[in-house]
Amino acid sequence: MDNNTNNKHAAGGPPMTFAMPMYHDFVPKWIRPWIYVVLAFCFQLSNGMYLGAMNNIVGEWGIMREDVQMCLYATLIGMALYFPVLFRMKFRFSNKLLLMMSAAVIVVCNILATFRMPLPLLWALCVVCGMAKIQGTFECMSTIQLWMTPKRDFGVFFPILHIILLCSIEVAGYLAAWFAFDMHWTYMHWLVMALMLVVLLVQALLTRPFHAMPQIIPLKGIDWMGALLWCVLWLQVAWLLNYGDWLDWWHSSDFRLVMGTMLITLAVCLQRMMHHPKPYIEPAMWTYHNVVPVILLIGVVEALFSCEHVLEMVYYEEVMHYADHTYEALNQWSLPGIVAGCLFSIGWLKLMRWNVYKLIALALVAFCIYAGGFYVLVDSNISIEQLRIPILWRGFSYAVLCISFMWCLHAIMSFEHFFQALSVFNVLHMFVGGLVGAALHGRGMKYYVADGFARCSGYVDSVRLSARAVDFPQMMNGIVEGFLAQSVKILFGWTLIAGLFFAALMLLWDIPMVRHQVKHIPAWPVVGMRVLRGVQRQRRLKRIRQLRRQRQ
């Protein structure tokens, strides 16, 4: 992506007039967009099941951790699956109806999710909940987009959007763990239901039906059968990667059976994509320049970030013996990093308009600081406060990478295929990349723990336990904790090396083989003056827009 492309997409279009005609006249204009920000945050707090209360759900229902995790992946699949039809829904139904229906569906799903039901039915329920969640969030954020950026500048919109998305994920995890610790895990479901009732009340009392298009566009031409096939395929992929380690991969007949059916489903999906007149995901989406490398890089980065859910959890639960509430409270230190990463992305993409590939490289360097911090700190005798700085860097890195990848897709694709690409992007971004990385990290944990026992067993055999009183169970518990901490440290080291490799790769991505002219890097005072001029330019544009509104 060259600088001209960056400038073209960063500049946006001419300023547009922002209005929210769906509100009744008695609602003050200044508060209208803020109400939708709160509603978007409420939608993002919702889920089918909440992983912050995973251990409590596992203990009460007598199921496995993988079963609860599969509920999360089903919710994410529902969100990813729904992207290609978001605008079709917006152009067919009114804003009020879409928000009220999304809130009502989430209420029903959260009520039913508190009952013990067959797992396939629970997963289907989570898929529907994910669809309602993304529909409500999209309707809120697309309505106030012009309020956030009058030129529809995605260098501003994507960072602000991710402040809401990523912060709500962390807050939801903490609330679920807090309710499970102090009360009962179902209280999180009741809180979400109460928030959805607030959404319904706001829409019923403050708004009226309003269509985004003067003429209603019907839903004809949508490949619903293709959407169902892709949903089944992604559920099969999630099941294989989620349960593969527990089933011992190819040694299980169930794993081989689901793998065979997954390959058949994949073949049917590809055949329909190539021959259907209007497939749900069009083959033309894959023909854009650099789209395949970007999507593959998304999967690789998510695989690296899986250390948060595998290595950190092993360290917290098995070595440090932290409860879920303690871990989620510690995880809130990623919030300052998330906000800082989003604001930094605005400065990079909007004010300075620098190359996005360098921004990805910088985010990977921040990830390396996080991985290196854990590599240095992992031990059974550290203070919990020492882990705050690496977690902050993790939040910064993840926020910048999410924004950068969405910016890349927006820059290289037309609007016609952008939301189809977002669907594939979110499949890799939300669960496939993370599950592949989790499988690799889990395999590494098994190898290094077994290797540690093999190396130590000879020394244990030579110890004369009868020579003095020894609490053998306590001694073995300390040895196991030491091996687990050592394995986590080793795998963080390998993750650090991989992060440095991909950071260097991104720095070299768009460097030509032969440089005909050398561009000198300006001194820091010059860079500071450019940043200051960018801020002043934005202030002048803001004053001009305010004057235009006053004249109107």
Region locations from a protein language model:
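12-transmembrane solute porter fold
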Residues: 30-46, 51-52, 109, 280-450, ...
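Helix-loop-helix hairpins in multi-pass membrane proteins, especially solute transporters
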Residues: 83-87, 91-224
